[in-house]
Amino acid sequence: MSGPSAAYYNNNVDALVHTGPCELIGVVLTDADAASLAIHDCTSSPAAGNKVLEVQVTTTILTQVVMLPTPITLKAGLYVDVGTAIAGGSYCIIWR
């Protein structure tokens, strides 16, 4: 195997996780309040046209785990855009 089978990235704010082609495998989002994030296939300036996945939590559903049955192929890069602020929690992006 030439590289890692998966990489993990943890944060709670907007971030460019990876530049260049990759595959999104999963997302975990947790917070004690309402929060949301979107994954975009870009390296900056996320827009509706390059959004590939959106994940949300609420005050009654504190954690969302999305493990994709088939990875989403990203060509430009993997950018996380936090929509509703993540107050006390965090997200974890799983990619390769």
Name every feature range the model reports, one short phrase each:
Residues M1-R96:
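Surface-exposed, low-hydrophobicity beta-strand/loop segments enriched in small/polar/acidic residues
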